[in-house]
Amino acid sequence: MKKQSTMIACALAVVSGVLLCLGGCNQSPEVVIYSNADEESRLAMQDALDRAGFSGQYIFSSFSTSELGGKIMAEGSNIEADVITASTYYLESAQQAHRMFAPLSFTFHALEKTPGFCAPLTAQEGAIFINTRALQENGLPRPASLKDLASPAYKGFISIPNIRSSSTAWLMVQALVSAYGEQEAGCLLHGMMENAGPHLENSGSGPLKKVRAGEVAIAFGLRHQAVADRKAGLPIDYVDPAEGNFMLTESVCVTDKGAGGNPLAMKMAETLVRTARPGILKVYPVPLYEGENFREDARSSNVKAFPNR
């Protein structure tokens, strides 16, 4: 009797295993997505994926820009993520070092030439922010360039992002190096950091928060944020610096995991490119693809790209 019970238990276990396999063997594991996107962009991406029927089939993990960039460079093709959205310059550097991304299998029509392994999702330009009220109250001249911000006249009145932790700061540094060369750019950056003092911010959004609050009169940040603030009636204006508005793009790519890769990863990347863009454009209104509407104030007239990105 005991032997018969054991046999029945074994048979039930086998049947359960077969049923489990029938129910789940054809299901792919969840796609792991790593991203440095801010909350608004992340929500637009997740909404696009969910509307495309991928709800519950992915894990979305958020990182800071520097944290994700370091992770990509350190882990290479051993990274857990199946899909990555990050600053394009990190992705290009990682691809050059590790050859870790698969060619995208879907077509898209970007306005600018792109490498075959990634497609742009967002674009941000750098600009100088001004709190017009604070500028007037402190009798400060309106700056026309980034170079102006190194003047002692602005000591204690500016806030800038820290190049060690913020990709927004990279836009500022690119403009300085392109216009003045590395040596003079270094001196100017030092002067700007001295002027910022305790208002040197690790987060790219930190300077915007300080200029909004009137803690400083001038800041450097992402242009579209100042445009939105001015439209909302805040005492915020922006200056397109004489050195030019450098642009930072963030792109999506798929990790090349060979035959063991998740087949849904490429489909999700395509969904982000095709259906997440309308939501992203509400936050980052710079057009990246053919057919996208161009708002007059969405892009400066002096957009530049660093030649050795």
What are the functions of these language-model segments?
Residues 89-95, 212-235:
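A ligand-binding cleft/hinge motif common to bilobed small-molecule-binding domains
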Residues 25-83:
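Conserved N-terminal structural module of periplasmic/extracytoplasmic solute-binding proteins
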Residues 183-184, 286-309:
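An extracytoplasmic/periplasmic, membrane-proximal ligand-sensing/linker region
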